[in-house]
Curated annotation (Swiss-Prot):
Pfam family, one: Ppnp
Catalytic reaction(s) noted: a purine D-ribonucleoside + phosphate = a purine nucleobase + alpha-D-ribose 1-phosphate; adenosine + phosphate = alpha-D-ribose 1-phosphate + adenine; cytidine + phosphate = cytosine + alpha-D-ribose 1-phosphate; guanosine + phosphate = alpha-D-ribose 1-phosphate + guanine
Stated family: Belongs to the nucleoside phosphorylase PpnP family.
HAMAP family (UniProt xref): Nucleos_phosphorylase_PpnP (MF_01537)
Record carries keyword Nucleotidyltransferase: no
A GO molecular-function descriptor: uridine phosphorylase activity
InterPro entries on file: Ppnp (IPR009664), RmlC-like_jellyroll (IPR014710), RmlC_Cupin_sf (IPR011051)
Name the UniProt record assigns to this protein: Pyrimidine/purine nucleoside phosphorylase
Gene Ontology CC terms: cytosol
Organism annotation: Pectobacterium atrosepticum (strain SCRI 1043 / ATCC BAA-672)
Enzyme Commission numbers on file: 2.4.2.1, 2.4.2.2
Described purpose of this protein according to its UniProt entry: Catalyzes the phosphorolysis of diverse nucleosides, yielding D-ribose 1-phosphate and the respective free bases. Can use uridine, adenosine, guanosine, cytidine, thymidine, inosine and xanthosine as substrates. Also catalyzes the reverse reactions.
Keywords, alphabetical: Glycosyltransferase, Transferase
Keyword match Magnesium: no
Species classification: Bacteria, Pseudomonadati, Pseudomonadota, Gammaproteobacteria, Enterobacterales
Length: 94
């Protein structure tokens, strides 16, 4: 089953799904902007197209992730994103 989600007045949209080879995950697109997301459980985020500038919990500096690069977010935390151009991503829930 596919679950469609929309955040930040439609500037972020994702489709959640579950599969044997990937587990629970979502794929989505973020329009340009700045966002703060909260996590319930740990997440593995991989950039597909575009780029994400990320401030992870407890990190002193922003990091830039480009296509094929992955970052991890602890559960029960918040992280900040700056998006310059529409960017697609894959999020795996760990």
């Amino acid at each position: 089953m596919l679950n469609v989600n929309e955040y930040f007045a439609g500037k972020v949209k994702s489709i959640g799904f579950e599969g044997d080879s990937i587990g629970r995950a979502s794929v989505g697109v973020m329009d340009a902007g700045e966002y703060t997301f909260g996590t319930g459980q740990p997440e593995e985020m991989t950039v597909i197209t575009g780029a994400l500038k990320v401030l992870l919990p407890g990190a002193p500096d922003w990091q830039v992730f480009t296509p094929g690069e992955t970052f991890f977010v602890p559960g029960k935390s918040e992280f900040n994103l700056q998006v310059v151009e529409p960017t697609s991503y894959l999020c795996k829930y760990l």
